[in-house]
Amino acid sequence: MSLAFFIAKTFSKDPNTQIGSVIVGENNRPLGWGFNGPPRSINDNDLDWSRPQKYKFMVHSEINAIAHSQGDLTSATLYVTAMPCPRCMLEIAAYQIKKVVYFNYKADEGSTINCSTEEESKEIATTAGIELVKFEGKIYV
């Protein structure tokens, strides 16, 4: 989880919401990582980072981690600094990632993630057989 926070703080240019994800396989071998931000083809220096203008350009950290992973994600574990939204949880299920460890329910106070989307994410995880665990340890960044 500490690596997910490091990735978020180091690479996300979003001034309000910095989310990081790390996917690990057997023996905690890293398979991929990601942060919230625009696709590589969009220069993030040219973006309006205010809400809601930024939303149309954002790729969530979970999707970036999946897209930039190497190796088989089946049975992998995803560590993420905030609860995945329902769309991300569907992608996690599509790649058969079996465990998601998250730190917070909300990314930040202005986040559009709310109780109803949290419940949807939990329902998708349960239906897909994904173990959903709230991280309770210490973070070292």
Positions of predicted regions on the chain:
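Zinc-dependent deaminase catalytic domain
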Residues: 1-141
